[in-house]
Regions:
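A short, well-structured juxtamembrane/interface segment
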Residues: 6-23
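A short, charged, Gly/Pro-tolerant segment at domain boundaries
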Residues: 157-174
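Helix-enriched interaction subdomains in cytosolic or periplasmic regions
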Residues: 1-3
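Glycine-rich phosphate-binding loops that contact phosphosugars or nucleotide phosphates
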Residues: 23-142, 146-155
Length: 174
């Protein structure tokens, strides 16, 4: 799943996604279920390097947040199927307010792809039972980690120090 997901996303597409993340005033990240865990993990990483990112899994709060977004903001929607009604409602509202949408979704054509400014694709060989979404979630996590590493590499002056400082603050809690 991970090799296939890397193969289907060109370096150019990945760098365009990095630019969307880096240039956004605010990044709202959402996903449902296992995709929501990937969203939360990625938002924490982005915050560590100074990117204003929020993960929102509560769909009522998500819709309230999205309607107040602007063209300077980015909605990152993570959904393997790309067909979750809640995620597509948020994407539709983001479009209405002029917000850009980055989707991390499956390669099979879906509703989320049609609304997104840009897509990164995950390839997963899920069984009918979706094997607890292990394959798709692993591919999503790999892509978000790749985006994070690229963002760090593009900001070597500040990002590593911010990560170290964040870790030092957390260590003070224990």
């Amino acid at each position: 799943a991970m090799h296939a997901s890397l193969d289907v996303n060109s370096e150019e597409k990945l760098l365009e996604a990095v630019a969307l993340l880096r240039n956004a005033r605010r990044v709202i990240i959402t996903g449902i279920g296992a995709s929501g865990l990937v969203a939360r993990n990625f938002s924490w990483k982005l915050m560590k390097i100074g990117i204003n990112a929020v993960s929102e899994q509560d769909m009522h709060a998500l819709l309230a947040t999205v309607q107040a977004m602007s063209s300077d903001d980015l909605l990152l929607a993570i959904s393997y199927s790309g067909e979750r009604r809640e995620i597509n409602m948020a994407a539709g509202e983001a479009l209405r307010v002029g917000c850009r949408i980055l989707a991390i979704t499956g390669f099979t054509p879906n509703a989320l792809q049609q609304q997104a400014t840009q897509c990164l694709y995950t390839i997963a060989e899920e069984q009918a039972t979706r094997s607890a979404a292990i394959s798709s979630t692993s591919a999503q996590m790999m892509l978000t980690d790749l985006l994070f590493m690229a963002l760090v590499q593009q900001d070597l002056e500040h990002a590593p120090d911010r990560i170290r400082h964040s870790e030092a603050l957390v260590k003070k809690l224990v």
